[in-house]
Amino acid sequence: KPYDTLEEVIGIRPSKGSLAEYGVTYRQVDLLPDGSFDYDKIRENINEKTHLVTIQRSKGYQTRPTLSVQRIGELMVDNCYGEFVETMEPSDVGADMIVGSLIKNPGGGLAPIGGYIAGKKECVENAAYRLTSPGLGKEVGASLGILKDFYQGFFLAPTVTAGALKGAIFAANVYEKLGFAVVPNGTESRHDIIQAITFGQPEGVIGFCQGIQAAAPVDSHVTPEPWDMPGYDAQVIMAAGAFVSGSSIELSADGPIKPPYAVYFQGGLTWQHAKFGILKSLQVLVQKGLVTEEQIRKAM
């Protein structure tokens, strides 16, 4: 299943200007109950009219495991949140094209905007022609005078991503010991920076996000609340007191207010800040009566 915000882009949920309006059809093959690929269904859904097979590496607003690089074959891969987490990238195992965001892992917290496309020449050129116009492709486009931030952020990205991973592992260990379901758990291998924590009630999701916001370097005085965000079929709450608007390699958390009431935590430009964010989230949950200080002492 794609990210919620892509459902209207594709046309799963009706929307003006969707791919469906332009006659582009879409088929979805879900993972099997054990998280493996349904190869029979995949074969059934590919025919001579198929132009693109794509896979989403990260979990989105689901609680399934993130897909490892080794499991991704010759596809177009949405690589968001997965860059620099493993020793290989999807292109190393045959992916035709990988795409992602520069305000996530590869921007290192410095890139203020942008995305990337990498892969086989034909695929990159096709994407470039669609982005601009036929005949121009990637030969034109605004650089906005910020290329230095791109390069410096890319240089720092592996270190920043490592700190975010450490923060996610810390969160998993603490919240699992408090009795909440976490994906992945504190000892499982990781393939992106996202930590899912299932609270089973909206108060937990809201309290967690309010704690993360309170730890932010920007707008820490703001109290996030769920709202009807465009592109989603349920209210969503987001905590992101970041230097770069929308940056989720910076300390952030979000989640839809619907069952199973899971929150998705990611980022932290340093491991110390990620740890501080988790401690603030615990403080808010204590204030809301969802956990006790004694439980936290035992979990730590």
Task: Give a label for each model feature.
Residues 1-166, 172-175, 179-183, 272-300:
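Conserved PLP-enzyme active-site core in the AAT-like
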Residues 176-299:
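Conserved C-terminal alpha-helix-loop-beta "cap" of PLP-dependent enzymes
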